[in-house]
Amino acid sequence: MPRKGHIAKREPLADPVYGSTLANKFVNSMMWDGKKSTAQGIFYEAMKKLEAKGGGEEAIKLFKKAVENAKPLLEVKTRRVGGANYQVPVEVNADRRTSLAIRWLISYSRGRGEKGMIDKLANELLDAANGRGAAIKKKEDVHRMAEANKAFAHYRW
């Protein structure tokens, strides 16, 4: 722990096209080997496809809705008490919520069956915006796990 207090969190830069810090975080999370221009190209093309498939709704609104729908409210953390391990449900703070949602959307996009990351990402974002898709299923699984272990909530620390 630092002796001089907490370090202030830097405000992330906004995305050059949409002016959204969330979009920039998404691109940074999607980037491999420092190839940001490649990640941006994939993201922007996916957003174009998302707008085409989205039924007239703006792509950035659909994107924000998808991330919002994928954010978990609760998760379980393992806590050791008296030789036994308990899955203790805890609330997820706002920054972690966003990063988990982004991480899940990207990983489940990569795992989809379509050809090309642009199509995979566009379809996963569209599914998440409509309350379907693998990222939403993951969120529901995490919530179900927290609900099942509600009896151990008093072990929170």
Curated annotation (Swiss-Prot):
Gene name tied to this protein: rpsG
GO CC terms in record: small ribosomal subunit
The keyword Secreted belongs to this UniProt entry's keyword annotation: no
GO MF term set: rRNA binding; structural constituent of ribosome; tRNA binding
GO biological process: translation
Species annotation: Koribacter versatilis (strain Ellin345)
Family named by the database record: Belongs to the universal ribosomal protein uS7 family.
Oligomeric form and interacting partners: Part of the 30S ribosomal subunit. Contacts proteins S9 and S11.
Name listed for the protein in its UniProt record: Small ribosomal subunit protein uS7
Origin: domain of life: Bacteria
Ribosomal protein in keyword set: yes
Keyword tags: Ribonucleoprotein, Ribosomal protein, RNA-binding, rRNA-binding, tRNA-binding
InterPro entries: Ribosomal_uS7 (IPR000235), Ribosomal_uS7_bac/org-type (IPR005717), Ribosomal_uS7_CS (IPR020606), Ribosomal_uS7_dom (IPR023798), Ribosomal_uS7_dom_sf (IPR036823)
Pfam families documented for this protein: Ribosomal_S7
Function description: One of the primary rRNA binding proteins, it binds directly to 16S rRNA where it nucleates assembly of the head domain of the 30S subunit. Is located at the subunit interface close to the decoding center, probably blocks exit of the E-site tRNA.
Classification via CDD domains: uS7_Bacteria
PROSITE patterns per record: RIBOSOMAL_S7
